[in-house]
Swiss-Prot record:
Pfam families: RNA_pol_Rpb1_1 (PF04997), RNA_pol_Rpb1_2 (PF00623), RNA_pol_Rpb1_3 (PF04983), RNA_pol_Rpb1_4 (PF05000), RNA_pol_Rpb1_5 (PF04998). The keyword Transcription applies. NCBIfam families: rpoC_TIGR. It comes from Haemophilus influenzae (strain PittEE). The keyword Nucleotidyltransferase applies. Its EC number is 2.7.7.6. The lineage of its organism: Bacteria, Pseudomonadati, Pseudomonadota, Gammaproteobacteria, Pasteurellales. Belongs to the RNA polymerase beta' chain family. GO terms for biological process: DNA-templated transcription. Zn(2+) 1 binds at residues 71, 73, 86, 89. It is an enzyme of class 2 (transferase). This is DNA-directed RNA polymerase subunit beta'. Its cofactor is Mg(2+); Zn(2+). Disulfide bonds: none annotated.
Length: 1416
């Protein structure tokens, strides 16, 4: 009885009994303890008998029997002898599977350094001994001696000696000292190290030194030494004296037909090691000459290197076919390695795949499954049913019946399949909606039928796509499939909370056609009593579908009690809309139906249905919409003919006008009035504008037609042109595509992104000539090449994102923080790009939201802002709200539900255990394939909008200028002299309505705080050049402007005007290199003028390419331009757009020419210059001056004597997120990354909720650098998880010690993934060798917190349905700890009282059995 209980206990303990995985160095004794015997011979198996050779690599005595429960010689067979060791062949009688787990070992005749600790940079052995890698290699590979014991000589420990030096030393000191070669020497040195003393010594050094590099070096060594001390690893274990041998079934030898064998490469590598080792043993026994032994030792070292990591040092050892052998390191790393191939993803049983076709008659929760497939997939279920029903006596009989496909089998199949959901998956599975559950409907044929509405989620179309089917087997799996993965439960997209079950294409066209109205249609003006009558009128031909009629419509409105009240009104509508109303669920307002329904409107319909009526109604409604849409699309008979593409008559006038303008510019260029760059820009602007005008004329022509109404008067109505209807409804095509069909194709781009200045004036209807076609091929082909690249890049980005965010899970309800991000609407120019409600919807308020201008609380803090509350915000015109955010969440190792807010895919506050990190990564990665790879084109047509050159106000209100400096010119207008000026217009309530960036040199007609009316133009500037504005009036004095040296003079042939162009420093003669062309302003007497209220001279340094059109001594007034600097031409400036931009942001890469930001607040001045750089000084009000060297070619935004604030831009450029974090803090960097990423996605029309990007930013910010460690466990300058610092600080606070000081650090996603606490997760991501080496040396523990680690060790993940399981394990563990403590104390007292009765025993046995069942 007792044994049985024990046996069951042993069975149930599988992967449950560990909570932490620790990795470390193996000591020789440990390796021997794993081993079941020493492998002495290189033989594998006997080629005649196929039996393993004794003591060889496949030896049965060491590794276990080849056949189950049978020894090698056949003396003992069968189960009854299990555990017996055969005296003849020495094999233990047991199962074969022990050959997968029993290890052997090889006793090495000479120690060998482990290549990972030697060559994986930084070399651990080198760091420990404080020697360069080159020197260690010289010793290891027998080129030099190293002193291990200096004795009384004047040699030093660790000194290298050549052969000659060694012999000399031996002559001088005989055996006073000891010097060795090879791994033994290194082993001796490592053995002789006193780690603690070394640590102390380094700590003292660290206190004394001041040099930064030295400090870095010492901290590196100190960290390594401390890791050794703490982990209990011994340094000499990095040199191996015993080599473990992998169990034979993990490096199999498979006989092929024809007497040959296929073998794992590892066997070759092991054979090599054993051969050399045995030869070395013999040589040592024979006392062979030193040089031979040395050579053999070196070869042994090399062969062990190859076994562990082939190709890491020297040339890789190759097999018979010139292919490098796969070593142990190669087995685990890379896509084909153990981690990614077998642990993170596996192939599964009970799956099939087939082509998909449309199932327009299916319900949303159904899919059509071919009978043949179903029969195969549900086989075991059918067998079981056949047996239990008594149709078959044995499994064999059942099998026969199924193979013969007897009639009864089909009945049973239908029964088995009923309510058994199956999973459908379409590769690539980019987000969680790529796998959904459906109920199968058996169909004839061989193709899976898919419901059209889920195509958007799968990104599927029916041009030959295939899908895979999986069968959830266990009851739990079926439950999860039905409750969580059913397509009806996934109506909303997790990326943005909008419905993803939206009709597209035909359905949209059908509904649009159905709800259009037509002037003077048949039956116009009829009075109908209800929608049924309207349908009757349409079916009998009394009225057309589009006719305007009056119908009595009954709406149902929910009252306070939640019941529906009927409300009937006579409504002006059309027949089609009335018919559509018949499928509307109760509780929807008719106003949503009484309009022309395009794709957006239909999406809104479904969204409203979901929010108002709940999931079930919404799903049924979506199905009805689809059926109706298909029916009426068929009725509409929409088709496209060539005559539908109507070319506007105005087109040719517009084009000829543009050609004249271009000719004029060309003339100006030839007469020297404009530069080549300006000409190019202007030509492109002209054509871009012409294209817009043609497009507008075409759309006006297409979109409207004039008809005669009932009164006999002409009336305009939307056109019934098929092409227009398709684009207008959102079914297919866009205005930009129609423009190419019937307008003009417009400007094209070259492959490098610059724009070709001759546009294609033809369109597809007229057809292109050869030249036009040739120009347009660039764009088209680049598009194809891009697509291929894009897919790979996008997949890689997704992989990195998932990896960095995988362990972020909702672990608690509320962390209690008051922190958050302040949200304001995003306004660019005169348009509100993103309204406030979109930004705060589904977030939790971090502080009470007050009614503007009062102290009245509108919404208390910690409230989830839903649609209704957002309406309240809009009604009270609130324009900034502080909301909780994951970036500021205080939870350690996870986030709380309140900081995350609404679960976008479900519409309520997020549940605990939801894997928000993975969802965020998928939401950002999935649209990645829709982003462009570079600059933005539409089918190659360059979209260069005419550049802005003025601000025209759209709303009446008040002007506000931010960080503006200006001078007032003699027309009393303001001329800006500051760089990053922002101009906003606010309305009467103080809400920001418009927001513009105004460049340096712009002329403003209104100042700060002045009123403007809508339509006024309040700022003007030249978009193609940047002026240098005079801030005082006076006379020009040229300094260092010397013709031929620093400037060239260009004279216009026609006008005779001459202008001076400053040369770039690189182009000047040597004499002119150090001169600085400057315009100085002096008064009438030639004295210097200072800028008003400063002691700074009024002088302006001119950069290269600047054009001066004034003469020396000319008079200038305030605000006049002194010179102009041409701006770069459009198109050639390569804006990194699309995917690479997103990747750069998440990788936190520093841009090529980053903006230079002010490190401190203070007054700017310039110090002594060096050859290529300027010295910028910032003097704060108190404290020491900060100085920075800036290259001369950088244009500065500050003048001497200006006051700057910390974080202000000193020189323009792309800002580095690291700088933003350092100077402006976490919130600013979050805002920056979120906005920049959103800009890229918005441009492509992709909607992603901000919080997904914030989740990734939180993971990028999870490390901190310790700046003041005090007496804590941390080192200064060490990189630690923020959560760990917070935990330590909480403890210190409780003890009354000062908190550890730290600075947050921003890591790119790849770096952040590799720097995660879990070494298993990091190793399965990238750079496996390096991660494992580091972890082993440090003796790291993996707490198995994240998802990846748990998948790899084969457990449920601590998220979703596995969250509770892990919580319970955690609780049990705590209870067990307490019980263990108690039992130690109480064992004595309990022993007397505790007697177990037979009943108790059987009860506990039953419990054990149940537990064992559960475990299985």
């Amino acid at each position: 009885m007792k044994d049985l209980v024990k046996f069951l206990k042993a069975q149930s303990k599988t992967s449950e009994d560990f909570d932490v995985i620790k990795i470390g160095l193996a000591s020789p004794d440990m390796i021997r303890s794993w081993s079941f015997g020493e492998v002495k011979k290189p033989e594998t198996i006997n080629y005649r008998t196929f039996k393993p050779e004794r003591d060889g690599l496949f030896c049965a005595r060491i590794f276990g029997p080849v056949k189950d429960y049978e020894c090698l010689c056949g003396k003992y067979k069968r189960l009854k002898h299990r555990g017996v060791i055969c005296e003849k062949c020495g094999v233990e009688v047991t199962q074969t599977k022990v050959r997968r787990e029993r290890m052997g070992h090889i006793e090495l005749a000479s120690p060998v350094a482990h290549i990972w600790f030697l060559k994986s940079l930084p070399s651990r052995i080198g760091l420990l001994l404080d020697m360069p890698l080159r020197d260690i290699e010289r010793v290891l590979y027998f080129e030099m001696y190293i002193v291990t014991e200096p004795g009384m000589t004047d040699l030093e420990r660790g000194q290298l000696l050549t052969e000659e030096q060694y012999l000399d030393a031996e002559d001088r000191w005989q055996d006073e000292f000891e010097a060795k070669m090879g791994a033994e020497a290194i082993q001796d040195l490592l053995k002789g190290m006193d780690l603690e003393a070394e640590c102390e010594k380094l700590r003292e050094e660290l206190q004394e030194t001041n040099s930064e590099t030295k400090r870095k070096k010492i901290t590196k060594r100190l960290k390594l030494l401390e890791a050794f001390v703490q982990s209990g690893n011994k340094p000499e274990w990095m040199v191996m004296t015993v080599l473990p041998v992998l169990p034979p079934d993990l490096r199999p030898l498979v006989p092929l037909d024809g007497g040959r064998f296929a073998t794992s490469d590892l066997n070759d590598l092991y054979r090599r090691v054993i051969n050399r080792n045995n030869r070395l043993k013999r040589l040592l026994d024979l006392i062979a000459p030193d040089i031979i032994v040395r050579n053999e030792k070196r070869m042994l070292q090399e062969s062990v290197d190859a076994l562990l990591d082939n190709g890491r040092r020297g040339r890789a050892i190759t097999g018979s076919n010139r292919r490098p052998l796969k070593s142990l390191a190669d087995m685990i790393k890379g896509k084909q390695g153990r981690f990614r191939q077998n642990l993170l993803g596996k192939r599964v049983d009970y799956s099939g795949r087939s082509v998909i076709t449309v199932g327009p008659y299916l319900h949303l929760h159904q899919c059509g499954l071919p009978k043949k497939m179903a029969l195969e997939l549900f086989r075991p279920f059918i067998y079981a049913k056949l047996e239990s029903r008594g149709y078959a006596t044995t499994i064999k009989a059942a099998k026969k019946m199924v193979e013969r496909e007897e009639a009864i089998v089909w009945d049973i199949l239908a029964e088995v399949i009923r309510e058994h959901p199956i999973l459908l998956n379409r590769a690539p599975t980019l987000h969680r909606l790529g796998i959904q559950a459906f109920e199968p409907i058996l169909i004839e044929g061989k193709a899976i039928q898919l419901h059209p509405l889920v195509c958007a989620a799968f990104n599927a179309d029916f041009d030959g796509d295939q899908m895979a089917v999986h069968v959830p087997l266990t009851l739990e799996a079926q439950l999860e499939a039905r409750a969580l993965m059913m397509s009806t439960n996934n109506v909303l997209s997790p990326a943005n909370g909008d419905p993803i079950i939206v009709p597209s294409q035909d359905v949209v066209l059908g509904l649009y056609y159905m709800t259009r109205e037509k002037v003077n249609g048949k039956g116009e003006g009829m009075l109908l009593q209800d929608p049924r009558e309207a349908e009757k009128a349409y079916r009998t031909g009394e009225a057309e579908l589009h006719s305007r009629v009056k119908v009595r419509i009954t709406e149902y409105v929910k009252n306070e009690a939640g019941e529906f009240d009927a409300k009937t009104t006579l409504t002006d509508t059309t027949i089609g809309r009335a018919i559509l109303w018949m499928i509307a669920p109760k509780g929807m307002p008719y106003s949503l139906f009484n309009q022309t329904l395009g794709k957006k409107a239909i999406s809104k319909l479904i969204n409203e249905a979901y929010r108002r009526l709940g999931l079930k109604e919404a799903v049924m409604f979506a199905d009805q919409i689809m059926y109706t849409g298909f029916a009426y699309a068929a009725r509409s008979g929409s088709s496209v003919g060539i005559d539908d593409m109507e070319i506007p008559a105005k087109k040719y006038e517009i084009i000829s006008a543009a050609e004249e303008e271009v000719a004029e510019i060309q003339e100006q260029f030839q007469s020297g009035l404009v530069t080549a760059g300006e000409r190019y820009n202007k030509v492109i602007d002209i054509w871009a504008a012409a294209n817009e005008r043609v497009a507008k004329a075409m759309m006006e022509n297409l979109s409207q037609e004039e008809v005669i109404n009932r009164e006999g008067n002409p009336e305009k109505q939307a056109s019934f042109n098929s092409i227009f209807m398709m684009a207008d409804s959102g079914a297919r095509g866009s205005a930009a595509q129609i423009r190419q069909l019937a307008g003009m194709r417009g400007l094209m781009a070259r492959p490098d992104g610059s724009i070709i200045e001759t546009p294609i004036t033809a369109n597809f209807r007229e057809g292109l000539n050869v030249l036009q076609y040739f120009i347009s091929t660039h764009g088209a082909r680049k598009g194809l090449a891009d697509t291929a690249l894009k897919t790979a890049n996008s997949g890689y980005l997704t992989r990195r994102l998932v990896d960095v965010a995988q362990d972020l899970v909702i672990v608690e309800d509320d962390c209690g923080t008051h922190e958050g991000l302040v949200m304001t609407p995003l306004i660019e120019g005169g348009d509100e790009k993103v309204p406030l409600r979109e930004l705060v919807l589904g977030r939790v308020a971090a502080e009470d939201i007050l009614k503007p201008g009062t102290e009245e609380v509108l919404i208390p803090r910690n409230t989830l802002l839903d649609e209704k509350l957002c309406d309240v915000l809009d009604a009270n015109s609130v324009d900034s709200v502080k909301v909780r955010s994951v970036v500021t969440c205080d939870t350690d190792f996870g986030v709380c539900a309140k900081c995350y807010g609404r679960d976008l895919a479900r519409g309520h506050l997020i549940n605990q255990g939801e894997a928000v990190g993975v969802i965020a990564a998928q939401s950002i990665g999935e649209p990645g394939t829709q982003l462009t790879m570079r600059t933005f084109h539409i089918g190659g047509a360059a979209s260069a909008a005419a550049k802005e050159s003025s601000v025209q106000v759209k709303n009446t209100g008040t002007v506000h200028l931010m960080n503006a400096k200006f001078v007032t010119n003699d027309e009393s207008k303001l001329v800006l002299t500051s760089r990053n000026t922002e101009l906003t217009i606010t309305d009467a309530f103080g809400r920001t309505k418009e927001h513009y960036k105004v460049p340096y040199g712009a002329v403003l007609s209104k100042g700060d705080g002045q009123e403007v009316t809508a339509g006024e133009t309040i700022a003007n500037w030249d978009p193609h050049t940047m002026p240098v504005v005079s801030e005082v009036s006076g006379f020009v004095k040229f300094v260092d402007i010397i013709d031929g040296l620093t400037v060239t003079r260009q004279t216009d042939e026609l006008t005779g005007l001459s202008s001076i162009v400053v040369q770039d420093v690189g182009e000047r003669a040597t004499a002119g290199k150090d001169l600085r062309p400057t315009i100085k302003l002096v008064d009438a007497n030639g004295n210097d003028i200072f800028l008003p209220e400063t002691d700074v001279l009024a002088q302006y340094f001119l950069p290269g390419k600047a054009i001066v059109s004034l003469d020396d001594g000319a008079a200038v007034k305030v605000g006049e331009p002194l010179a102009r600097i041409p701006q770069e031409s459009v198109g050639t400036k390569d804006i990194t757009g699309g995917l690479p931009r997103v990747a750069d942001l998440f990788e936190a890469r520093k841009p090529k020419e980053p903006a230079i930001l002010a490190e401190i607040s203070g007054i700017v001045s310039f110090g002594k210059e060096t050859k290529g750089k300027r010295r910028l000084l910032i003097t704060p009000t108190e404290g020491e001056t900060y100085e920075e060297m800036i290259p001369k070619w950088r244009q500065l935004n500050v003048f001497e004597g200006e006051m700057v604030q910390r974080g202000d831009v000193i020189s323009d450029g792309a800002e580095t997120p690291h700088d933003i974090l350092r100077l402006r803090g976490v919130r600013a960097v979050t805002e920056y990354i979120v906005n920049e990423v959103q800009d890229v996605y918005r441009l492509q029309g992709v909607k992603i909720n901000d919080k997904h990007i914030e989740v990734i930013v939180r993971q990028m910010l999870r490390k901190a650098v310790i700046t003041k460690a005090y007496d804590s466990e941390f080192l200064e300058g060490e990189q630690v998880e923020v959560a760990r610092v917070k935990i330590v600080n909480r403890q210190r606070e409780a003890e009354g010690k000062p908190p550890v000081e730290f600075e947050r650090e921003l890591l790119g996603i790849t770096k952040a993934s590799l720097a995660t606490e879990s070494f298993i997760s990091a190793a399965s991501f990238q750079e496996t060798t390096r991660v494992l080496t580091e972890a082993a040396v440090a003796g790291k523990r993996d707490e198995l917190r994240g998802l990846k680690e748990n998948v790899i060790v084969g457990r449920l993940i601590p998220a979703g349905t596995g969250f509770a399981y892990h919580q319970n394990r955690h609780k049990h563990r705590l209870v067990d700890d307490v019980v263990a403590k108690l039992s130690e104390e109480d064992e004595a007292t309990i022993a007397d009282e505790f007697v177990m009765t037979a009943d108790d025993a059987s009860a506990s046995l039953a419990e054990m059995l149940n537990m064992a069942d559960d475990a299985e």
